């Protein structure tokens, strides 16, 4: 099976070629990804939906991460990334329903990997019950609603841990409801500016909706 091929870019964002995914990560080349954050507002409090990454993932296994995300393959456009919502979550959404935030650059370093992403980032407000999601077991092992105010306090170092509520898949693939204690180290270490831009955008959208 041929390895995924990704478009690569220079520091200025100009397309410079195509490279295999493993080489892109090994060499630290800029490439495009699709990110979609699902959120909801409950009793005037914003909650964001995080996925728990599969323990066999090559980057940041077992950590809490963006609701749905994936690489854009060579020649693909941001609209093609909407497939990730269907594949990872079983959620059928049109690209036009997503709220675009633009491109946010994000650099993460892990053992043997330099991940330099140009993230086409989107928001989607959705209050679908967690039990109605059909997650991709090879990629995701659970989903958790996370309080945004508490998460900001956690990332700022004001609290050491917080409780997140959701489900984990059991060994036979059945979802089991769970309240889990999470520390900052349990979240994928996206750059501070990345999280700040996403959180600020969610708060603006929620405030605008409340004022309508």
Model-derived segments and spans:
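Nudix hydrolase/Nudix homology domain
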Residues: 68, 102-109, 113-212
């Amino acid at each position: 099976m041929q390895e995924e091929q990704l478009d690569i870019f220079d520091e200025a964002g100009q397309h410079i070629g195509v490279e295999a995914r493993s080489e892109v990560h090994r060499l630290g080349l800029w490439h495009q990804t699709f990110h979609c954050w699902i959120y909801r507002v409950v009793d005037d409090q914003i909650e964001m939906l995080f996925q728990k990454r599969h323990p066999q993932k090559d980057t940041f296994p077992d950590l809490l991460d963006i609701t749905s995300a994936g690489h854009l393959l060579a020649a693909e456009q941001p609209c093609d990334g909407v497939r990730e919502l269907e594949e990872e979550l079983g959620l059928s959404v049109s690209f036009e329903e997503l709220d675009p935030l633009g491109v946010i650059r994000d650099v993460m370093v892990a053992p043997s990997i330099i991940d330099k992403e140009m993230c086409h980032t989107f928001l989607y407000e959705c209050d679908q019950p967690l039990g109605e999601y059909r997650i991709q077991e090879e990629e995701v092992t659970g989903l958790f609603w996370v309080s945004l105010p508490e998460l900001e306090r956690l990332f700022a170092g004001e609290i050491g841990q917080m409780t997140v509520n959701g489900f984990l898949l059991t060994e036979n693939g059945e979802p089991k409801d769970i309240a889990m204690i999470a520390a900052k180290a349990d979240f994928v270490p996206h750059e501070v500016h990345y999280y700040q831009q996403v959180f600020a955008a969610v708060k603006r959208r929620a405030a605008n909706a409340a004022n309508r």
